[in-house]
Design a protein with these regions (language model features):
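Hydrophobic beta-strand positions that form the internal "hydrophobic ladder"
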Residues: 75-76, 121, 184-185, 228, ...
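Residue-level detector of Asp-centered blade-edge/turn motifs that repeat once per structural unit
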Residues: 70-71, 116-117, 179-181, 223-224, ...
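Bacterial N-terminal signal peptides that target proteins for export
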Residues: 2-12
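Bacterial signal peptide processing site
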Residues: 24-26
């Protein structure tokens, strides 16, 4: 999947290409294989009992990181496709119609997310550093992810007007999402490591929330704004950490195992949720604030198959949600929890295509 070389919000750049060992765990309970009433038969068959009325919204290219507007009526997503050679941010209706460009069309963009009033969108872009698409990393150093230091975070009207730059410091600033009060949480390398920060919706009052050795990022608020969920890993001193820092100083990252964590919105009470092995990423809270959905390859010995899983916030009751043989990732619940949007390779006409799907969620 080519799009995995470039994604920023949640590892896409490398995670799927890795062959990571996956540890077995008695923490996981697969759901009963009973078909939902309106489940559409696909490559995954009737095992996905949490899904009803699955609809494919995009057709061809590399489409991912689709997120609902606050009123649940629209989606913002990023795409590379014919006529769009480098990731750009678009919005569309829930039926896949009325796609409109939101970003400038220059550079590479990632991680579009609606403000609570649905009048603006936040996203990251490299266009201020160079109007051209930044090159992918060389694989001479192994499978690595580019952490582009030209990424900065912007606010823009939903029609693409009134672009405002929110970050302007050296280093990678991206992976921005927004809480119900309009506060932004994002990932930055401004202090020499991949850490999570928050700031006001206009870019002020920047606060560092994590302070660990290792790649913390991909943060999302809970629906009530009290907690943040993210993927990460703390790397102890030693050869692995030295390699991590050496690459990061060159704007690169070699992903290793990743787990899901939660913390309070101010960075306190950081707690590890999963201990599965493999790479778990792209977590998002269910609106009830008690469950987290995420993507992981922990169950696949070769590490290439990513499925969606759900876990209680205390780490219990891991439940497998999808049964696809390739990639499912970037899940997000609608504000009322009635729908789920995600990206998948399933049923692709062209090998490597990644498309956006939406389903009715079955409790």
């Amino acid at each position: 999947m080519n799009f995995l070389r470039h994604r920023c919000c949640a590892l896409v750049a490398s995670v799927l290409g890795l062959v990571l060992s996956a540890c077995a765990s008695d923490q996981v309970e697969e759901v009963a294989q009973e078909p939902a009433t309106e489940l559409t038969e696909s490559s995954s068959g009737s095992q996905e009992r949490r899904f009803a009325n699955i609809r494919q919204l995009t057709f061809g290219g590399e489409n991912a990181e689709a997120y609902f507007s606050s009123d649940g009526s629209e989606l913002v997503f990023q795409t590379t496709r014919e006529g769009v050679p480098c990731d750009q941010i678009y919005r569309m209706d829930l039926d896949g119609e009325n796609m409109e460009l939101v970003s400038t069309g220059d550079g590479r963009t990632t991680c579009g997310y609606f403000y609570p009033n649905d009048e603006s969108i936040v996203y990251a872009s490299t266009h201020a550093g160079d109007l051209e698409c930044p090159p992918p990393p060389s694989f001479e150093m192994g499978y690595v992810w580019a952490v582009y230091d030209t990424y900065d975070i912007y606010r823009v009207g939903t029609d693409g007007s009134d672009l405002v730059q929110l970050t302007d410091v050296p280093g990678y600033d991206a992976e921005a999402t927004i809480g119900p009060d309009g506060r932004i949480v994002f990932t930055s390398v401004r202090d020499g490591d991949m850490e999570i920060y928050s700031m006001d919706g206009d870019g002020g009052d920047v606060r560092r929330l994590t302070d660990r050795q290792g790649p913390d990022g991909g943060p999302f608020f809970s629906a009530d704004g009290s907690k943040i969920v993210f993927r990460g890993r703390e790397i102890p001193d030693g050869e692995e950490y030295e390699d991590y820092k050496r690459l990061l100083d060159q704007g690169l990252w070699r992903p290793t195992s990743l787990e899901i964590f939660v913390m309070d919105a101010d960075g306190s009470n950081l707690t590890q949720v999963t201990d599965l092995g493999g790479a778990s990423f792209g977590p998002f809270f269910h609106p009830d604030g008690e469950r987290i959905i995420f993507s992981s390859n922990w169950h696949n010995p070769e590490g290439r198959n990513f499925d969606l899983f759900m876990v209680n916030i205390d780490g219990t009751g891991v439940e497998r949600i999808t049964f696809n043989e390739t990639f499912d990732g970037f899940p997000m619940f609608s504000p009322d929890g009635s729908q789920l949007v995600f990206a998948s390779n399933r049923d692709s006409v062209t090998e490597g295509d990644t498309n956006v799907f939406i389903v009715d969620w079955v409790e």
